[in-house]
Amino acid sequence: MWGRWRGAGGRRGVAQPVIPQMKLLGGRVPLGASALGLLIVCWFYIFPGGERLPGHKEMIRQVLQFGPRWGRNRSSGDSFRKLLQDCCDPPRLFSMTKANTALGENLWYDGEFFQSLTIDNTTRSLFPQDTPIKLPLKRCSVVGNGGILKNSRCGEQIDEADFVMRCNLPPLSREYTDDVGTKTQLVTVNPSIIDKRFQNLLWSRKSFVESVSVYKQSYVYMPAFSTKRGTDPSLRVYYTLEDFGTNQTVLFANPNFLRNVGKFWKSKGVHSKRLSTGLFMVSAALSLCEEVTIYGFWPFQMDLGGRHISHHYYDNMLPLSGVHAMPEEFLQLWHLHKSGVLQMQLDQCKKDVSSKKPH
């Protein structure tokens, strides 16, 4: 399944080919190197990098030009759902279950090469028999954490959905509820959050339980089997919530689902080390839900009115560079919006009646 790289060095006693040389700017450059350079140029022409993507001003122009008109295209939605079903089978593979994971199975991590885990009785006992999410879902809200949500007054509209997905333990305190709502059926948690904010639950179990209580009776969705270092923190989350008798249920992301979703979007032109959590959730929602509206998916520093906005609605902490391809992801989602597959909320849901927001 996993290929291995072979060394390029020649064997002793075997004559090595002479690489032809060509003159360039007074020096000599291997012909192979020039061919490689041409290949790289062609690659960036065919698969342009971020510098060739539309900037925020161009995207604002496109969004404003498209206007508020939007209609759900059920035919396009059904076709896209079939694509996701064929590649990734989200209803069956979205989370780890006893039904999709055999005892003794060698489970390959999706975020690391050559790393796997053998599923034993202890690990398998943490999985539900089948997915506990009752399918199909009718209306879903997927809430990203983009700064465009600030002062959007979209909270009420978000909460009207039957199923609300949120990403990476976002704050839902009173100062934000007008904009992002409070309802949550599923919230994702990256193991890195458990490490940075809760010291891997070695000393901060109670503070973690208090933090997730805001999500009430929801599913806590964790990529426990994406990297080896993320497995133990994810299992600690499971045991912590179980020990405290909370209302949350931990679901572990199936690495086969995450891997296949990554391949799917790569085939569509998203070239990144790893997809954002938001795009994983949108992909799941488009398969599990009949109607999908997404909020807070805007990777630019200005809103539609040309005003500077923070990276998140709650802070301005920037992500690590080189991991995600947020503009490329946005363009894919914008195309789905224009096609009527999903609705992307980019403007205020309710217009402000005063300069000061009521609370």
From Swiss-Prot:
Pathway info: Protein modification; protein glycosylation; Lipid metabolism; sphingolipid metabolism
Enzyme class: transferase
A Pfam family reported for this protein in Swiss-Prot or TrEMBL: Glyco_transf_29
Protein's GO biological process: ganglioside biosynthetic process; glycosphingolipid biosynthetic process; N-glycan processing; oligosaccharide metabolic process; protein glycosylation
One Gene Ontology MF term: alpha-N-acetylneuraminate alpha-2,8-sialyltransferase activity
Positions bearing carbohydrate: N73, N121, N247
This protein's name: Alpha-N-acetylneuraminide alpha-2,8-sialyltransferase
Species for this entry: Xenopus laevis (African clawed frog)
SS bonds (residue pairs): C140-C289, C154-C349
Catalysed transformations (reactions): an N-acetyl-alpha-neuraminyl-(2->3)-beta-D-galactosyl derivative + CMP-N-acetyl-beta-neuraminate = an N-acetyl-alpha-neuraminyl-(2->8)-N-acetyl-alpha-neuraminyl-(2->3)-beta-D-galactosyl derivative + CMP + H(+); a ganglioside GM3 (d18:1(4E)) + CMP-N-acetyl-beta-neuraminate = a ganglioside GD3 (d18:1(4E)) + CMP + H(+); a ganglioside GD3 (d18:1(4E)) + CMP-N-acetyl-beta-neuraminate = a ganglioside GT3 (d18:1(4E)) + CMP + H(+); a ganglioside GD1a (d18:1(4E)) + CMP-N-acetyl-beta-neuraminate = a ganglioside GT1a (d18:1(4E)) + CMP + H(+)
Predominant localisation class: Golgi
Gene Ontology cellular-component terms listed: endoplasmic reticulum; Golgi apparatus; Golgi membrane
Spans traversing the lipid bilayer: 29-49
InterPro entries recorded: Glyco_trans_29, Glycosyltr_29_Sialyltrsf, GT29-like_sf, Sialyl_trans
Tissue-by-tissue expression: Expressed in the dorsal blastopore lip and in the presumptive neuroectoderm in stage 11 embryos. During gastrulation, strongly expressed in the involuting mesoderm. At stages 13 and 16, expressed in the neural plate and neural fold, paraxial mesoderm and notochord. At stages 19 and 22 (neural tube and early tailbud), strongly expressed in the neural tube and notochord. At the tadpole stage, expressed in the head region, branchial arches and otic and optic primordia. Also localized in the notochord and weakly expressed in the somites. In adults, expressed in the brain and ovary.
Localization of this protein: Golgi apparatus membrane
Signal sequence annotation: none
Cytoplasmic side: 1-28
Keywords annotated in UniProt: Developmental protein, Disulfide bond, Glycoprotein, Glycosyltransferase, Golgi apparatus, Lipid biosynthesis, Lipid metabolism, Membrane, Signal-anchor, Sphingolipid metabolism, Transferase, Transmembrane, Transmembrane helix
Record-linked PANTHER family: ALPHA-2,8-SIALYLTRANSFERASE, ALPHA-N-ACETYLNEURAMINIDE ALPHA-2,8-SIALYLTRANSFERASE
Annotated positions binding CMP-N-acetyl-beta-neuraminate: N145, N168, S276, T277, G278, W298, H312
Residues of the active site: H324 (proton donor/acceptor)
Coiled-coil blocks: none
Role: Catalyzes the addition of sialic acid in alpha 2,8-linkage to the sialic acid moiety of the ganglioside GM3 to form ganglioside GD3; gangliosides are a subfamily of complex glycosphingolipds that contain one or more residues of sialic acid. Glycosphingolipids are required for convergence extension movements during early development. Can catalyze the addition of a second alpha-2,8- sialic acid to GD3 to form GT3. Can use GM1b, GD1a and GT1b as acceptor substrates to synthesize GD1c, GT1a and GQ1b respectively.
Membrane-topology descriptor: Single-pass type II membrane protein
